[in-house]
Amino acid sequence: MDLIRVNEAHCRDCYKCLRSCPVKAIRMERAPFSQQLRARVDESRCVLDGRCIAECPQKAKSVRPAYPSVRSLIAVNDDVWVSLAPSFVAAFAHLRPGQVLAGLRKLGFAGIRETAVAAEWVAAAHRKIAEKSQGPVMTSSCPAIVNLIEMYIPEMLPNLAPIVSPMIAHARMLKKEAPCRKVVFIGPCLAKYDEITRPGLTQDVDQVISFVELETWWAEEGIDPSQLEDEYFDGPAPLEAVLFPLDGGLIKTAGLTPDMLSNRTLTVSGLDNCQDFLINLAASEPVPMLVEMMACPGGCINGPLMPADSDDAFARRMRILKYREERPNYRENCPCPAMENSLADDARAEHADYEFLQRTYENRQIISVEPTEEQIKEVLAMTSKYAPEDELNCGACGYNSCKEKAIAVLQGMADPEMCIPYMRTKAESMSNLVFFGTPNGVLVVGSDERILDMNSSAERIFGTSRNHLVGTLASQWIIDSSDLRRVFEDNEEIVRLEKELPELGLIVLVTVVSAKKENVALVIVEDITSQRQRETELQLVRGVTLERAQEVIDKQMAVAQKIAGLLGETTAETKVILTKLMRVMKEEGNTDGAVSGDWRRPTE
């Protein structure tokens, strides 16, 4: 159905929904990219008690809204009626019952009646069946209990009264008056959304919305019921049946005693209690005649879809009881006819027509493949559980035992890393690996500037034991008090501050960071003494190398100068000789010209 939706951004894998789910219908899956665990309701296993919605601390779970469909239904149909659960009195602490009815009329409903009208017929039918039965009869008004029995304890189906819930009975009554009428049930129950889809019940109620949805709808329409005048129901006003949303309400309405000391009747509320009772019923003596079971502790007044501002369970119960006390006054002022609470009397019950209350059930037992012991051991080993004493069975993951969680892992419902003690140990071991395995010294300094802890590398750097340093002031060893105050008071960070520790013959780099949540500072000390020594040695080598290089350069310059001098002398001598030679050659040329005569033409 995709009825329960999960906002993955808000789901913080706290496992509270899983811890609160009696049938463990929560599937833990990893998100595609972040790989973080996220909870998803497996509706094929869910009995729809809705506790996971109410218990989620991040409000990450919600119900698929149905009121838009109801609004559309009203828009095209002028005969849409409300069947209003009697728990409405407890749902809206700031409203009078008549104001709730006025608010509903503002939404466009053609008529409003109390579901409790049909509850009296349902209660009488249960009494009649119980009195004729040889074994205990389980009430069937709570759809979550019906789901529990059909899916997990089907052997109890013969004991489940074949009677529809007051919601279905009331819808059938309303549609008997007008076959084309549409019926919308409004209440605090999640399982009602599913009940109207069960075989044999699909033609009765057209839509279900919760009190939470009703508030949202009012807000969208700009309706403030607290500003409206009281209105009345359109139909009979039941009396005892207004107690139906309380544990023991059905038995009381049936004219039986809900006394806890009676062995004829028994009231069990809370899905855990109901589950335990049904499983252990065979060993019970004596067996009660009629067992009223309600999935919500204390009854429907504590349903998962009650408004958040509807007070505590005790206040809700008291409002229902007060409403019952004031019922005679309501009847006097109400224009609708009064409904006598005589349906449970033997005379009326004997002749009442219960055919329209009949229903059947189906065996929907959840069948899971049970893994072998070897497979279970392999999963347990993933979280370092190799022997029974390693299994803490703490329940932090949501399962009752480590073995139960291992089975869930094999069935695809859980993840090995859901084991909180294992993950804590793993995280601590990784932290210890970083803390104790790093070559740098790490000091944990408190706000009083005293050393709280240190790792073995710090012992090596400071040349003393942990016991000698813990409790002493950090300023005695490594960091000035003024620097620490900057870290604690101004939340500053000191990064790679170089300090000399002459008494230890060390040169270190100091980094100080604040762990504000723990109110401590981490002083990280990196020993760079050997590095600085290497740098000094390298500097010396560089100096010597530069000197040698300069000597070579000087020698090369001297040689070059000598060579240049010699070349200069040789060049000068060569120049003199060549000059003389050129002069001689010139003189010889002039002599040869005079002997041969003048070759130029004579002038005229």
Predicted ranges, named:
Residues 467-483:
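PAS-family sensory/regulatory domains
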Residues 540-604:
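Signal-transducing coiled-coil/dimerization helices and immediately adjacent hinge/linker segments
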Residues 63-361, 365-367, 371-380, 400-408:
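Iron-sulfur-associated redox domains of electron-transfer enzymes in respiratory
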Residues 514-559:
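Sensory coupling linkers of modular signal transduction proteins
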Residues 480-530:
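PAS-family sensory/regulatory modules and their coupling/dimerization elements
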Residues 458-469:
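PAS/PAS-like sensory domain cap-loop motif
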